[in-house]
């Protein structure tokens, strides 16, 4: 269904997908649908500011409305094969995720593509993160280091200076 306003979907569909190029528009577009208790898929990133996302998800929990948001990269066969091999390695020391990212993107900067790497990393190593540090490069390439409480370190290579496919490596 094509509608002029998100709330016009209420009564026409059983669930909705909310998708904008910039994540700051996702939750405002989803609010009326949430209040109508409509199950939601919200494209990545779920939101642009953490506090806004926490309030939205707390409201969804209170209303008992299912909400999901994720990168599609972990659904790909190559990612699933990597995850399976990773489990066979035993204790992981380091994980490196590389992919495209323009931190000055008009569609939300690092949130636009960086979320793909974050999603892949936390699915593989979990959320028990003790420290995160970003390093801004002199040009368009940057990195972020993620330290885990149980030992592993993940690095995100945010490549803005060339066309870089998403990929992972681990030790």
What are these regions, as identified by a protein language model?
Residues 4, 42, 71, 133-136:
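Short loop/edge segments at beta-strand edges and connector loops
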Residues 15-21, 27-71:
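Beta-strand-loop-alpha-helix segment that lines the small-molecule cofactor/substrate pocket
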Residues 21-24, 46-47, 73-75, 137-139, ...:
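Short beta->alpha connector loops
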Residues 2-12:
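Short acidic low-complexity segments
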Residues 1, 165-171:
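Short, intrinsically disordered, charge-balanced linker/junction segments flanking boundaries
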Residues 97-165:
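Rossmann-like dinucleotide-binding domain that binds NAD(P)(H)
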Residues 47-107, 117:
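A contiguous active-site-proximal alpha/beta segment in oxidoreductase catalytic domains
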Residues 14-15, 94:
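Short, Asp-centered acidic motifs that coordinate Mg2+ and/or phosphate
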